[in-house]
Amino acid sequence: MDTPLGSIGMIICFDVEFPEIARTLKLMKAGFMVTVNINMHPYELHHHLFSRCRAMENEIPVMICNRLGTEGEFDFCGDSMVIDATEEILLSLKDKEQVKTVSLPIKQELDPMRSYTANRRADMYDILTK
């Protein structure tokens, strides 16, 4: 989705656990990603790990909006967060409904020695499409 701030890549829930989707959004020039989740206990570690990985490996910020509360047998863990391009968590809302703001560096200075984008080997990806 194109905005005055740049292109936003949208990911829905479980899709954040697959690196190919986030990489495709990065290659389509997404400047940052937004993930809408309904992650529940005991899987809160999953959205932490995968979201931080997607930010780091694609060198773009990731925002996670996760449901909070209980419905039937499901206990949703909340913990919406904003992660910068170096995988640092800038904001975490934990387990309360809150509204907060955070300054997000859209064009962040990154360590060129740790550039996953520059060092990717697309010539080795053929096996992934089989």
What are these regions (language model features)?
Residues 1-58, 63-64:
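Active-site beta-loop-alpha substructure in enzyme catalytic cores
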Residues 67-130:
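C-terminal beta-strand edge segments of enzyme domains
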